[in-house]
Swiss-Prot record:
Cell location: Cell membrane
Record comment: activity regulation: Inhibited by the anti-tuberculosis drug isoxyl (ISO).
Protein name, as recorded: NADPH-dependent stearoyl-CoA 9-desaturase
Organism: Mycobacterium tuberculosis (strain ATCC 25618 / H37Rv)
UniProt modification remark: Is rapidly degraded by a mycobacterial protein degradation system that specifically targets the residues LAA at the C-terminus, leading to a post-translational proteolytic regulation of DesA3 essential activity.
One of the record's GO cellular component terms: plasma membrane
Disruption-associated phenotype: Strains lacking this gene are shown to be attenuated in a mouse tuberculosis model.
Length: 427
C-alpha cells in the first residue's frame, strides 16, 4: 500500500525533518536574494525566441506546401508550441516571474497556447497537484482518472487497455489537461455543484473554441491566400504540430511522477502536515531525468521535477544550480535522489502501465515493496534498531541504505532458493 507515515518511511526523526526544512528554506532564500536582471533577461529572450520560431514555422507553411517545407514548418511550429507551453506558460503561471512586476509576464495574466484555460490549470495543477502531490484520492494526476499507475488503485476491467489509454492521452494531451478541471466523473455521478460545473464548462468552451478557431480555421484560411499553400496543408500541419507538443509534454510530465522510486501516499499524510514533511513528500514523490542544456530547455526544466516541486515559484533557469545543493541535502540525510536517463525513466513509466494492466494476482511484487509503490512495511524485517548511525562506519543509515538492505536480502533469498531447488531435484 502507499506510504502512511512519511517520517517512518524516510527513517528520519522530527528533529531531522525540522533541520531538513531549514536547509531547504536556506536554498530558497539564497535564490530569492540573487534574482535579478540575468533572470529577467532570460525569460524575455526566451519569449522573443519562441515567438520568432512560431512566425518562422507559419511562414514556412504559407510559403510552400511541398513535403520538405511542410515538414519543416510543422516541426518548427511544434517546437515553438513546446517551448511556449513547457518553458514559458507552465512556469509563468507558477508565478516564477511575478517578482518582475511585468503585467505581460505574470501568472495572473498569461494565457497559454493550448485548449485548456490558464485559470483552470492554476487550480488543478498549481494548487491541487502541487499541494497534494501523489496522495491517492486527492491528486488527480495519479492516473488522471483513467490509468492504473500503482497497485494501490483497485484493478478494473478497462485497465487491461492501460497502454492504449495512455497512447490516446499522449496524442490528445492538451485536451486531457483542458477537461481535467471539468470533473466529468463527478458530474455524471451527480456529485458536482451544478452552477460551478456550468461556469467551468462555459470557460472551457470559450478557451477551447478560440484555440480550435485559431489553429484549424483562421491560420489555414490565412495561409490559403498564398499561392504556395492550401487550407488543407496548413490545417494538417497544425494538427501535427499540436500532436508533437502533446506527445512531448505527456512524456516529460510522466517522467516526473511515474518512474520507479516516485512514491505514493495515503490521505492520512495531510493531517497537520508541517512544512518539513511537505518538503519530504515532494522529494520522495517526484523523479528527475538527466539532461544537458538543450533537453533541459525543451523540457521546461522539468527534468528537475524534484527541485520544481520543492520550489515551484522559483525561476526555471535556476533549477539546475539548485539541483546540486538539493542532491547534497539528500546525501546528508541518506535520502534517494531519483533520476536516470530520459529514455530509461520514460521506459519505466510504460513498463509500469503495461504491468498494471493486469490484476495483482499476476504480479510478483506486493503493494508494500513494488517498483512503482512502496510503504514503511517493506522495512519490517530490518528491525527497529536499523535507523541511526552505522556502528561500523558511523555513517547515517537512512532511507537509501534501508532500501538497499531490503533489496540485498531479497536477492539473497532468491539466490538461496535457486540453489536449493536443483538440490531438491537431485534428491
Amino acid at each position: 500500500m502507499a506510504i502512511t507515515d512519511v517520517d517512518v518511511f524516510a527513517h528520519l526523526t522530527d528533529a531531522d525533518i525540522e533541520n531538513l526544512a531549514a536547509e531547504l528554506d536556506a536554498i530558497r532564500r539564497d535564490v530569492e536574494e540573487s534574482r535579478g536582471e540575468r533572470d529577467a533577461r532570460y525569460i524575455r529572450r526566451t519569449i522573443a525566441a519562441q515567438r520568432a520560431l512560431e512566425v518562422s514555422g507559419r511562414l514556412l507553411l504559407a510559403g510552400s506546401s511541398r513535403r520538405l517545407a511542410w515538414w519543416t514548418g510543422a516541426l518548427t511550429l511544434g517546437v515553438a508550441k513546446i517551448i511556449e507551453n513547457m518553458e514559458i506558460g507552465h512556469n509563468v503561471m507558477h508565478g516564477q516571474w511575478d517578482w518582475m512586476n511585468d503585467p505581460e509576464i505574470h501568472s495572473s495574466t498569461w494565457e497559454w497556447d493550448m485548449s485548456g484555460s490558464s485559470k483552470h490549470w492554476r487550480y488543478t495543477h498549481n494548487f491541487v497537484h502541487h499541494k497534494y502531490t501523489n496522495i491517492l484520492g486527492m491528486d488527480d494526476d495519479v492516473g488522471y482518472g483513467m490509468l492504473r499507475v500503482t497497485r494501490d488503485q483497485r484493478w478494473k476491467r478497462y485497465n487491461i487497455f492501460n497502454v492504449v489509454w495512455n497512447t490516446i492521452l499522449a496524442i490528445g494531451f492538451e485536451w486531457g489537461v483542458a477537461l481535467q478541471h471539468l470533473e466529468i466523473g463527478k458530474i455524471f455521478k451527480g456529485r458536482a455543484d451544478r452552477e460551478a460545473a456550468k461556469t467551468r464548462l462555459r470557460e472551457f468552451s470559450a478557451k477551447a473554441g478560440r484555440q480550435v478557431f485559431k489553429d484549424y480555421v483562421a491560420f489555414p484560411a490565412l495561409t490559403s491566400l498564398s499561392p504556395g499553400a492550401t487550407y488543407r496543408s496548413t490545417l494538417t500541419a497544425n494538427v501535427v504540430a499540436n500532436v508533437i507538443r502533446n506527445v512531448w509534454s505527456n512524456a516529460v510530465i510522466f517522467c516526473g511522477h511515474f518512474p520507479d522510486g516516485a512514491e505514493k501516499f495515503t490521505k492520512t499524510d495531510m493531517i497537520g502536515e508541517p512544512k518539513g514533511q511537505w518538503y519530504l513528500r515532494q522529494m520522495l514523490g517526484s523523479a528527475n531525468f538527466n539532461a544537458g542544456p538543450a533537453l533541459r530547455f525543451m523540457s521546461g526544466n522539468l527534468c528537475h521535477q524534484i527541485e520544481h516541486h520543492l520550489y515551484p515559484d522559483l525561476p526555471s533557469n535556476r533549477l539546475h544550480e539548485i539541483s546540486v545543493r538539493v542532491r547534497e541535502v539528500c546525501d546528508r540525510y541518506d535520502l534517494p535522489y531519483t533520476t536516470g536517463s530520459f529514455l530509461v525513466q520514460y521506459g519505466k513509466t510504460w513498463r509500469t502501465l503495461a504491468k498494471l494492466s493486469l490484476p495483482d494476482k499476476y504480479l510478483r511484487d506486493n503493494a508494500d515493496d513494488a517498483p512503482e509503490t512502496r510503504s514503511e512495511r517493506m522495512f519490517a524485517g530490518l528491525g527497529p534498531g536499523f535507523a541511526g548511525a552505522d556502528p561500523v562506519t558511523g555513517r547515517r543509515r537512512g532511507l537509501k541504505t534501508a532500501i538497499a538492505a531490503v533489496r540485498g536480502r531479497r536477492r539473497s533469498k532468491r539466490m538461496a532458493k535457486s540453489v536449493t531447488e536443483p538440490d531438491d531435484l537431485a534428491a
